[in-house]
Amino acid sequence: MRSLHGTGVALITPMLPNGKIDFKSFKKLLRHTSKADYWVTLGTTAESATLTRSEKTAILEFVIGNNTKKIPVVCGFGGNNTSEVINELESIDFTGVTAILSVSPYYNKPSQEGIIKHYSLIADKSTVPVILYNVPGRTSSNLSDKTTIQ
């Protein structure tokens, strides 16, 4: 894995008034942030929970295809339905992706054991390293130190 260090930019998803992805603006965003040490695409800042699977695929392909400076790319893949996250992971080509950023399950408030099982299943299926995304203010659950180490 390429080392991630420095400043990463969490990319938004520019949208047109008709609800379609604005790839022209997205290209400008990539140029504007091209001095970042890495990009985070499809994270919570990109409002990925509101995107369809085909939109996510199109965005990831667009970012990878326009990554002329070969900036490391971290791709957000998370959710509260472990099976669906795994299904998405298995359907995506991660060529050009350095790691995935996976938010802990939200809404259903899993136990620490549930969080461990969730991340273990994702890590087993992922072809790239998994970064644990702990944001208790949004997920209503907090990764304990012990859970993170496991």
Feature-to-residue mapping (PLM):
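Active-site beta->alpha loop and helix N-cap motifs at the rims of alpha/beta catalytic domains
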Residues: M1-N142, T148
